[in-house]
From Swiss-Prot:
Keywords assigned: Cytoplasm, Ribosome biogenesis
Encoding gene, per UniProt annotation: rimP
Compartments reported by the entry: Cytoplasm
Lineage: superkingdom: Bacteria
Protein name, as recorded: Ribosome maturation factor RimP
Species of provenance: Janthinobacterium sp. (strain Marseille) (Minibacterium massiliensis)
Purpose: Required for maturation of 30S ribosomal subunits.
GO biological process terms held by the UniProt record: ribosomal small subunit assembly; translation
Family to which the UniProt record says this protein belongs: Belongs to the RimP family.
Amino acid sequence: MQLSALIEKTVVGMGYELVNFEQAARGLVRVFIDFTPEDADKGAITVEDCEKVTHQLLHVLTVENANYERLEVSSPGLDRPLKKLSDYVRFAGAEALVKLRMPMPNAANRKSFQGILQEPVGETLALEFEGNDGPAKLEFTLADVDKAHLVPQVNFRSRKA
């Protein structure tokens, strides 16, 4: 079985979502996990979640004689990548940065947009952003996207006692 399929089967079987998987230099395998959309109310992935998945993956990769040196399992972070249509559904209403493969002629030939994700309609994705002439809406498909990720929302103000 291919390494990516092996990792996805294991992670999904444990009740998590495989967000991304990378094979880096010197045999490093990085796995990014999150809760499934149904379990999103559990909050953020914890160290204990990563530890459980790491432990299981180590066993599976050893049994399957997979070629790797080191394994890292972590959460996708605050700037979580958006790769699947289900990601755009799940994070509708969130702020995101979307970089397209080709410039959009109806948007001043820009390729990079930051704005609020809208609920997808079929295969059509949408992002509301601040254009030169005020609020604008960009419609695109998953095939148009080069990279996309959430924009971290961090509040550095301390709570008042």
